[in-house]
């Protein structure tokens, strides 16, 4: 699997999600399952995606006491997902315990990624929760904390990629939502970029939802994006 594209499955019904999944090639993307779908459909849905040979990013953004998060991460590893995430704002100890619990899995452990600042958040949103810093300042602070904890990388907006790449090095994975091909709606993302621009900036993986899932021909859009990013 070499594709950098992660397709976000944001559906209410299993049948609708699988109808989309059955139109696309697992060699051209991975799939992201978030809170809504996982809460509704559970682990059996993830298993169905695995049966179709898709790698799965389990996007549940764990944020709790260290022991609880570590156990949840272990459960995700047992499920066989490719990537799982947690909130860096849960703190260093929470992240360290989550990383440590994956050690017995060796090369079969999922990538463990931290969420820094949600891409919908702006300066005012941070100020309202007591953080007197710009989104970029907070992202950089949490990315350094994530790296200190030994995690594999962070989720960040495309505009933050170049700074994070320089600050954290080439081996630190950068997963970027807020990806919109030219001519598509920005939706509820506030900090967005085209796929080509994001890859040039240094993104490792691009999370793309509606531009693919709501397209008349999802397979063709996916193929086109893969071609555009090389």
UniProtKB/Swiss-Prot annotation:
Keyword terms: Decarboxylase, Lyase, Pyrimidine biosynthesis
PROSITE patterns to which the protein is assigned, alphabetical: OMPDECASE
Entry-linked SUPFAM superfamilies: Ribulose-phoshate binding barrel (SSF51366)
Reactions the enzyme catalyzes: orotidine 5'-phosphate + H(+) = UMP + CO2
Keyword Translocase: no
Signal peptide start and end residues: none
Active site: 61 (proton donor)
EC number in record: 4.1.1.23
SMART domains for this protein: OMPdecase
Function, as annotated: Catalyzes the decarboxylation of orotidine 5'-monophosphate (OMP) to uridine 5'-monophosphate (UMP).
Protein name from the UniProt record: Orotidine 5'-phosphate decarboxylase
Source organism per UniProt: Haemophilus influenzae (strain PittEE)
